[in-house]
Regions:
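Short, flexible helix-loop junctions that flank or precede catalytic/ligand sites
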Residues: 1-378
């Protein structure tokens, strides 16, 4: 497959994905091109791609530097913006000796907090002068999208300097009321470490530092918050409790007392998100858990009593907090998601089922037993 032919083929696939409101395109050997729409992967051609096809498609969208990195490490992350098509985040890799790629759509229009339907308290969180805000979720849960919406709100509503350090840069933020500096690792800076070390010399008000994967990155995040900046990052976990446990486990036992004190003083919010299929079949809805670092939460973190935080969140809705199960109840009550999907994504199936049975107005018109026979009591 020639480069021009490969480039046209991949662009046609990307256009098709956008027309179907897909989120991800999968290119892999011995399997047809496939795309994910509303969380479900479907083939878009009966003909499987061979190893030569996948190699040609990957090389067609890489520049020389990316191709050299891929040749050396067998991994490469980058973003592309084919003219007239859109912007996409790409992860290229080798599997069983063949090239594979996953290409994710980056929406052309910046998302907004109102447009995403996420809680309004996020507007207050992102306007904080200082502190650490962590967005939590699994891969594909919409963390980056919500984070982009929060950054855009800050960009519109304040005057300052926003720095983002990403690999790759996903959403491109124009300068509005803020100066926005976006640095891509490998393109604008040699490493995360170098970019993070130098960011404090650039007079930032907000630092968005992408995903926290290890202790060193977490230390930078806490240091930024301690020095009077608003630091925002993402973390792979399923809930606020799990995220705190994961952060604690980044550090050796002898450093955890200091870590817990640092988190109790500097954490601003923990925002956990999942995407649930909408009841009408048109896309997915963001269901969000929010933990805010109130004095009571701060005290629990300082003591290491992470398991007790969920109960405080349940009782603090007046402050803007909510658990996943409370958010699922609201989404069910608003006819946004089905009863089955609410239970399927619940932290405690039994608690949510009981809450719906006792407090839901919608439940009176729904057969709550239908389709839920396989759900375990937790």
């Amino acid at each position: 497959m020639e480069r021009d032919q490969a480039s046209k083929f991949i662009n046609d696939l990307l256009r098709l994905m956008i027309s179907r409101n897909g989120s991800d395109l999968f290119i892999t050997g011995e399997f047809p091109p496939a795309m994910k729409v509303d969380g479900k992967v479907t083939k878009v051609s009966p003909q499987p791609l061979n190893a030569g096809h996948t190699m040609a498609l990957a090389r067609a969208i890489m520049n020389d530097k990316q191709a050299a990195e891929f040749e050396r490490t067998k991994e490469c992350n980058f973003a592309i913006s084919p003219p007239g098509v859109g912007r996409f985040r790409v992860n290229a890799f080798i599997q069983q000796g063949k090239v594979g790629m996953v290409m994710r759509v980056i929406p052309a229009v910046l998302p907004t907090i109102d447009g995403l339907g996420v809680p309004q308290v996020l507007k207050e969180v992102v306007m904080s002068k200082r502190g650490l805000t962590i967005l939590v979720g699994s891969t594909g849960s919409g963390k980056s999208t919500t984070l982009a919406a929060m950054v855009d709100w800050r960009n519109e509503q304040s005057y300052g300097h926003i720095i983002t350090i990403e690999d790759p840069v996903e959403f491109v933020h124009p300068h509005k009321n803020c100066v926005v500096t976006q640095r891509e690792v490998g393109l604008d800076t040699d490493s995360w470490e170098a970019a993070l070390k130098n960011s404090l010399r650039q007079a930032p008000d907000v630092i968005l530092m992408g995903e926290v994967r290890d202790r060193e990155t977490m230390e930078h995040a806490i240091a930024f918050a301690e020095t009077g900046h608003l630091c925002m990052c993402t973390l792979h976990a399923n809930s606020a409790n799990q995220a705190l446990d994961r952060i604690i486990n980044f550090f050796p036992e002898e450093r955890r007392t200091q870590l817990l004190m640092d988190l109790s003083l500097n954490l601003k919010a923990m925002v956990s998100q999942r995407l649930i299929p909408k009841q009408d079949g048109k896309g997915r809805a963001a269901v969000v858990e929010i933990m805010l670092n109130t004095p009571l939460i701060s005290d629990l973190i300082f003591k290491g009593d992470v398991s007790e935080i969920k109960e405080i969140m349940k009782k603090s809705r007046n402050l803007g907090m909510q658990t996943f199960d409370q958010a699922l109840f609201d989404a069910f009550e608003a006819h946004t998601i089905t009863y089955e999907d609410a239970l399927r994504n619940a932290d405690s199936v039994n608690d949510l089922r009981l809450q719906i049975k006792l407090n839901s107005k919608r439940a009176k018109s729904v057969d709550l037993a239908a389709g839920t026979e396989d759900f375990a009591i937790v």
